[in-house]
Design a protein with these regions (language model features):
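N-terminal accessory segment at the very beginning of proteins
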Residues: 1-224
Length: 224
């Protein structure tokens, strides 16, 4: 259907198929969508991006650690030996996340070793290593054999109304997720917006953005 609508040769056939009044209704709908998008468009935040800054203190616990920096704090929380959750807050108030899907007490705390290692801190389980740079709060994750998994560049930053996370993209990592997208399933090499849009009247492969943008990213790596 998309090819039919976008082919100028099919325009006369398409117009003959339309019932009286449909063209006017379609134009009015498009005008209404444009007007509402303009009216309710959110103002873009301004100002510099903030980071945690240099790490000033670390509070280790049975799940990992809370690292307090110059301008914010990081929480490194190991859900299991191979799954870790990272949170960042400017006010350093980390309240327990609520979930309807997890029964209280269902998780078993993994063994986590915390130590100061030269220019950073090191948290390690039986499966993962998390390294935190003291001068910046940047995170690096490795497997226990030293194989890198993820490296911040520069990492978690924020300003009013926005949060940004940047990391180095390892060679060969396949990129999936981010909601409804067109084109190849592996998104590597593309620049995509996390913004919902209703393209009219149709869209070809590669159109961005579409109806559902979800800030969930899945990176798949293969290690021999």
């Amino acid at each position: 259907m998309a090819n039919f609508l976008l082919n100028p040769k099919n325009l006369p056939q398409m117009l003959r198929a339309l019932q009286p009044g449909m063209i006017g209704a379609a134009l009015r709908y498009n005008a209404a969508v444009t007007a509402r998008n303009r009216r309710f468009r959110s103002a873009r935040p301004h100002g510099p991006w903030h980071t945690t800054g240099a790490i000033r203190a670390i509070e280790s616990n049975e799940r990992g650690a809370i690292l307090r920096g110059e301008h914010g704090a990081l929480e490194i929380y190991f859900v299991s030996p191979e799954v870790v959750r990272v949170r960042a807050r400017a006010d350093a108030e980390f309240h327990p996340p609520f979930s309807y899907a997890v029964v209280d007490g269902a998780e078993t705390a993994p063994a986590v070793e915390c130590q100061s290692a030269g220019p950073g801190y090191r948290l390690q389980t039986s499966h993962l290593i998390c390294e935190i740079a003291k001068d910046s709060g940047r995170l690096t994750f490795r497997m226990v054999d030293g194989t890198p998994i993820s490296e911040d560049a520069p990492g978690l930053t924020w300003r009013a109304g926005e949060v940004r996370w940047s990391r180095r993209l390892p060679e060969g990592e396949m990129c999936y997720g981010l909601g409804e997208r067109t084109g190849a399933l592996n998104l590597r090499g593309r620049r995509l917006r996390l913004w919902n849009s209703d393209p009219q009247p149709a869209y070809p492969s590669g159109t961005d953005a579409l109806y559902a943008s979800i800030p969930f990213y899945l990176g798949v790596q293969f290690h021999p």
